[in-house]
């Protein structure tokens, strides 16, 4: 199927202070946005796509000056694709605290004239949703046809249905969870510790030193990447294959250089990530993941937390996702059904682990396509 083609981001400036959950406020901030498709006259065909940890507003298409930079969900969003831009007006928003153009630690603090660095406030999923709602206001969108996201993006979609129940018709939550488990928080803590202990971190103000804590970022990404893959997928891709020089006489080198293909792969992923991502952003986003727990205010009762929701839901999980296992999605489905909400649940048998939500799996995409057909019929009714 064809791509959406060449796209251009736009920066939206907001001067009305945004009150954050931690009690502080951002007086002025920018959000980078990309849109695809056309908003209809009734403004009823808009879909908000929320991004995960290392993604951004660049959901689909390519840039004229960087044709290799394909949108992170290009296989899902575009003409004739499951989220069909011939039918829907799709918005991607880069969240606060990111390193891809929206106001974050790398941005200049107007009160000091220097990058925010470690002084940038800790933000939450709820803060992001409030900021996204202001983007909707700027477009004159009173109600989204759907709010959609995978992983951390799914948490934002769920939060939308709880915080703004009258502003979305459908909520699509893919490979996500209503809260992190202790194990997931532990993975995030180990990743953050690798960054915080890097000598080049300088308390988060490494910009002034002209360095970047690449070693810490590299290890953080390696840890995270392991959790995004399934054991079966890693076995199929790498097994115990060795990275030997051609014609090598010995099976092992008997040192601590790269021996196995899986080691080489993780180091490559870590190096690539450390080149383009920001360490302070990584700390902020993983902490936002940790804090998301809408049931906390209801003594841990997820059913009670969802009492005021009104949306129709599509919840999708993947059998080999052990980061956010299907049991977590089923927990959400049960809580929604307790309120007799209209819920479609798909548990897709896919070998790729958590990252399956980003891949072009036929059963997964057929589910999404069928659901968006239903939404399109409602929009056009």
Swiss-Prot record:
Gene3D superfamilies: 1.10.1740.110, alpha/beta hydrolase (3.40.50.1820)
Principal location class: cytoplasm
Site (Important for acyl-CoA specificity): 323
Cited Pfam families: Abhydrolase_1
UniProt-annotated location(s): Cytoplasm
AB hydrolase-1 domain span: 45-360
EC code: 2.3.1.46
Catalytic residue positions: 151 (nucleophile), 321, 354
Family in the record: Belongs to the AB hydrolase superfamily. MetX family.
Quaternary structure, from the entry: Homodimer.
Protein name: Homoserine O-succinyltransferase
Lineage: Bacteria, Pseudomonadati, Pseudomonadota, Betaproteobacteria, Burkholderiales
